[in-house]
Amino acid sequence: MGTMPEKKTLTVQRVLALVIAYITLSVGGGVAASLFLLPAVFGANSVAKAVIPSLSVEGIDFDVTSLPQKSTMYASDGTTKITEFWDQNREVVPLKKISKYMQQAVVAREDRRFFTHGGVDVQGVFRAFVQTYMKGDHQGGSSLTQQYVKNVLILQAQQDDDPIAQYHASEDTIARKVREMLISVQMEKQYSKPEILQGYLNIAQFGGNSLYGVQAAAKRYFNTTADQLNIVQSATIAAITKNPNAYDPSVESNQPESEKQRNIVLQLMNEQGYISDAEYQEAVNTPLADTLDVQPISTGCMAADYDAGYFCDYVVHKILNSKEFGKTSEDRERLLKEGGLKIVTTLDIDANTLLNETARNTIPPEDSSGMEIVMASVKPGTGEVLGFGLNRTYDATEAAQNDQTRDSMNYAVDREDGGGMGFSIGSSWKPVNLVAWMEAGHSVNENLQTSTRYSTSLFACDRYTGGTDTWNVTNAITNGTVNPETPALGLARSHNTTQASMGSIIGLCKIADTATELGYHDANTGETLDKTSSFVPAMMVGNVNVSPLTMASIFAVYASNGVQCDPIALKQVTDVDGNDIKVPSANCHQTVDPEIIQTLAWAINQSVVRSDGAGGVAQLANGRKTFAKTGTHEDQLVTTGGFIPNQIATFVLVGDVQNPVGHPIANIAINGQYHSYWDGSTIAAPAWRDFMNAYAERKQLPIDNDYGQPAAKYSATSSTVTKIGGGKQNATQQQSTIIQQQNQSLQQQSQQNDQQDDQDQQQTEDE
């Protein structure tokens, strides 16, 4: 950072030289002649060398319409505002959309000879000189054009992050005054008076909290627009620029002085013929407080309406991560806060509201369990993210770090989008396996040999060597095997052993490839399944790293007859001139055979309607055919995913998302209800059901009970049994094999018990 030049003492000689420079600019030789006076103004020393370069007008953006403007985020209807983003709260409007009273009030207050001088007000300079240096009463002599120039220079220095330029643009120095004169004269030659007035009315500060421009001021103080400002309102706003923080009328303690300053402006307007005596009297007799309708300031995701803080944060991350909005993250952030964007998102206000209500009703934020619930919903066939539900309030402040009810991390999304590292989801994953199974040419009603012990070599494929380890598999409900069992029944009963048998036949690579087709990627790294540490047999029972949003998107494929779409949060973004900015595409495409999807939907529904199914509690109201799959990852996380065909897909996850291993969801009371064992059906499925019922009722979603008709080629039955690893045998051979396996298993278990007894005995002897 450069050293600021020392402020030069104002001697009488230098003040006189400055006055002559003003006169020369305004009357005689213009810019060129004024340069001969600069040595007298600055002096010929090292300070001058630091100051004089700042007098150059090259590289200054004179465009009176090019100003930083706030961006506004909207819900999917394009009209419901969610929040705004700005460094300077400004909304540029043309002069024709600013009331004549507002224009007149500013001219009366700041520069009564604005329409007659050439950029520098000679009379104003002499008046200021006399008042300041002869009577000791500091007076400003800058014309309205000069004030506009000053604001432009300050703004450009801020945007360039140039502290030296900021010093020259804002410090009370002779250099600044002369430079403003030079530029003002040039501006008056390039732009008309109305254009300069428009620029000033849009750039000037009209209050605290970074409030700039008359449009933002009109909305803030009077809940109106600049073109509707009346005499009293205009005078109030015009008075603020002299001291934006002290005269801000939204601050109650400022109001007496603000009213006094307003009345001064009204008097000037009357003296200069802008308002009549009667209008003046009526205006000054109007109490300021009676005219105000102060609106709250809204900026950033913490100010988002409709409980959309987490959704807003997701959108911001999408903008900052998308090259469509700039080359670098810094460029994209500047565009967001200064570009005047209209951001139309995919947010469904009803969905988002109901998601959050359901989340907090299921587990209150202050619940002693400390458990969290995370929900995400997607519109099938579009990729549109409808909303998120968390039993936390979005809060990006440091105070939230010690408050379990508040958080800024959206655990529903990937790490790069402001979320976590992903979660294991248990049996909610199993429909992926079934899609892969059918894509490999198999039927969901094929009889499979199952076991509780599998050699990892059985799952080998071109990207997985398998090895010689043993994978021990159990079923949470039966704690054993059903042998033989079909993939459809294995899904309905949520049996892990059947998933393992399927994997031994088609291999892990096929399942990983299908997961990629459906839209799976690692929440932490973004990699496909076969490129992560999750690429092991346990992935078939949901040991993966996936976000709830990704799972909602996968269930959306099941809900849209096999159309896969990437999640999107942006429908349309336009710049300040109304031009469309390209937004990330959902890349929707047919990825799975519709007959496979229909068969899968039938199988998922069996989980709900069968008496031995794992998802009966998810049944929706009004006889609506229900498609939901529960899941439990050990005793750490419980889940449910499901959909209403072609309408909505939702995924729910419950647990301590920050410490699932250290804080299991077992032997614990949640919202006053105790269970020694929690699973997807005890809390995640009821939450899913409650939300889906509420959303279906709110939106009056049609009932489509024809969805989920199994295709013959994927649901054919067979009298043979497919062995583990492939191959066929008849039912009699299968039963014999089962008895042999059971005897072998019992013998192995007996040997293991004997070995453990020997170890225990040895340990006792050692002690």
Task: Go through each PLM region and give its residues.
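Short pre-catalytic segments that frame enzyme active sites
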Residues: 79-91, 214-220, 243-252, 331-336, ...
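Conserved catalytic neighborhood of penicillin-recognizing serine enzymes
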Residues: 134-158, 297-302, 442-511, 536, ...
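A penicillin-recognizing enzyme superfamily signal
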Residues: 345-366, 375, 388-391, 396-425, ...
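Peptidoglycan glycan-strand catalytic modules in the bacterial/periplasmic cell-wall system
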Residues: 67-276, 492-496, 503-507, 519-521
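Bacterial peptidoglycan biogenesis and beta-lactam-recognition machinery
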Residues: 98, 108-121, 134-140, 188-193, ...
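Extracytoplasmic/periplasmic proteins that interact with beta-lactams or build/remodel peptidoglycan
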Residues: 40-43, 60-75, 139-147, 152-180, ...
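N-terminal type II signal-anchor transmembrane helix
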Residues: 1-72
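Proline/serine/threonine-rich low-complexity "mucin-like" segments in extracytoplasmic/periplasmic regions
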Residues: 710-767
